[in-house]
């Protein structure tokens, strides 16, 4: 169970790294597009319209990527029916405080002789594993949305050269 918990944390970290990279990618492209749009020279082939539309789509993708990096707290992903404190969750540890935490952890998590773990520890670990799985799933889902928007933005930027090629080919056929 501990290995599975570690795996869920690793998946969350991986998804977060992907979203951070996508946010950086969007930021660089938005900066480049803004630089091109601010140029005093007119952009060829209608790129100004494509860049303006792409800029909007990239901005939305960047917002989604940024949203995925925002932390989720236990009460946002797991509804409790009592005042139980999960001593594996940083928010509960913070509420308990430094003075009380070591004693509570020892009372709840020290196994009896012959046992490798307490039922309370296994329960808390299972809850944390499930929560990290939800968080990782959310981060990957948001990455897919943002990544799809980035691909859509690139599709928009491809419209002017594709139209140019089509016009060029049609003009060659009429010769």
Curated annotation (Swiss-Prot):
Residues spanning the membrane: 17-37, 44-64, 146-166
GO terms classed as biological process: defense response to virus
Q: Enumerate the UniProt keywords alphabetically.
A: Antiviral defense, Cell inner membrane, Cell membrane, Membrane, Nucleotide-binding, Transmembrane, Transmembrane helix
The record describes its membrane topology as: Multi-pass membrane protein
The record ties this protein, via InterPro entries, to: PycTM
Sample GO molecular function, one term: nucleotide binding
- GO (cellular component) term, any one: plasma membrane
Taxonomically, which superkingdom? Answer: Bacteria
Provide the protein's localization: Cell inner membrane
Role noted for this protein: Pycsar (pyrimidine cyclase system for antiphage resistance) provides immunity against bacteriophage. The pyrimidine cyclase (PycC) synthesizes cyclic nucleotides in response to infection; these serve as specific second messenger signals. The signals activate the nearby effector, leading to bacterial cell death and abortive phage infection. A clade A Pycsar system.
**Protein name from the UniProt record:** Pycsar effector protein RsPycTM
For this protein's source organism, the top of the classification is: Bacteria, Pseudomonadati, Pseudomonadota, Alphaproteobacteria, Hyphomicrobiales
């Amino acid at each position: 169970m501990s290995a599975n918990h570690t795996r869920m944390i690793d998946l969350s970290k991986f998804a977060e790294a992907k979203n951070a990279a996508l946010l950086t990618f969007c930021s660089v492209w938005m900066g480049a597009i803004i630089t091109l749009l601010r140029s005093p020279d007119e952009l060829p082939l209608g790129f100004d319209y494509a860049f303006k539309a792409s800029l909007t789509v990239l901005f939305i993708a960047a917002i989604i990527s940024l949203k995925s990096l925002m932390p989720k707290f236990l009460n946002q992903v797991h509804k409790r029916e009592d005042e139980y404190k999960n001593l594996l969750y940083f928010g509960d540890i913070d509420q308990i405080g430094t003075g009380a935490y070591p004693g509570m952890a020892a009372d709840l998590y020290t196994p009896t002789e012959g046992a490798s773990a307490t039922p309370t520890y296994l329960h808390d670990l299972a809850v944390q594993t499930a929560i990290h799985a939800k968080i990782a799933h959310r981060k990957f889902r948001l990455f897919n949305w943002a990544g799809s928007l980035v691909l859509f933005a690139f599709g928009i930027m491809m419209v002017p050269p594709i139209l140019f090629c089509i016009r060029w080919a049609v003009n060659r056929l009429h010769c």
